[in-house]
Amino acid sequence: QRQMCIRDRYPNVVIIKAFTKIFCMPGVRLGYALCENAALRKRMRAMLQPWNVSVTAQEAGVAALVDCEAYLKRTREYIKKEKFWMTEQMRKLGLNVWGSEANYIFFKGKAGLYEKALKSGLLIRDCSNYEGLTEGHYRIAIRSEEENERLITWLEKL
């Protein structure tokens, strides 16, 4: 619904979505584009390869869409709950955490945190190469409760 509103208000905006993250399909190249501008849609279609989606990706996409409303609702509720908990825990540790609508948490921590996490078997995104950001800016994804607790426990020990 939100995407439809954006399309109506901004006809030259193209919204691109992938199944990869929300449906946990790493490596499966499947997604879609929403575009109100007919001329732009025609140009985009002209650039597509004749067989641009594999049979495997098509089957995975169809399977993902079965009961997807219930799945998406559960997923959003889980992410909201875990993100709230993690944000609170990180703030208690003195980390500067920014709010977002995404399934990840953006925060400012000590320089070198990425390397320390890697040595401990944890993966966080070093955002220091993003334009306008400096060393010490990181991003973490909301994962399983066990993985989230492991990350918080690790941060507490630093």
Could you tell me what each predicted segment is?
Residues 119-120, 129-158:
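PLP-dependent enzyme catalytic core of the Aspartate aminotransferase-like
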Residues 2-6:
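Short, small-residue-biased leader/transition segments that mark boundaries at the very start
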Residues 27, 101-102, 132-134:
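Short acidic/glycine-enriched loop/turn segments that link adjacent beta-strands
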Residues 16-18, 100, 127:
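Conserved beta-strand termini and adjacent loop/short-helix elements that scaffold enzyme active sites
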Residues 35, 107-110, 142-144:
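Short beta-strand-to-loop capping motifs
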Residues 10-13, 121-122:
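Glycine-enriched alpha-helix->loop->beta-strand junction motifs that scaffold or abut catalytic
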Residues 12-91, 95-96:
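PLP-dependent aminotransferase class I/II
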Residues 79-80, 84-121:
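Conserved PLP-binding catalytic core of the aspartate aminotransferase-like
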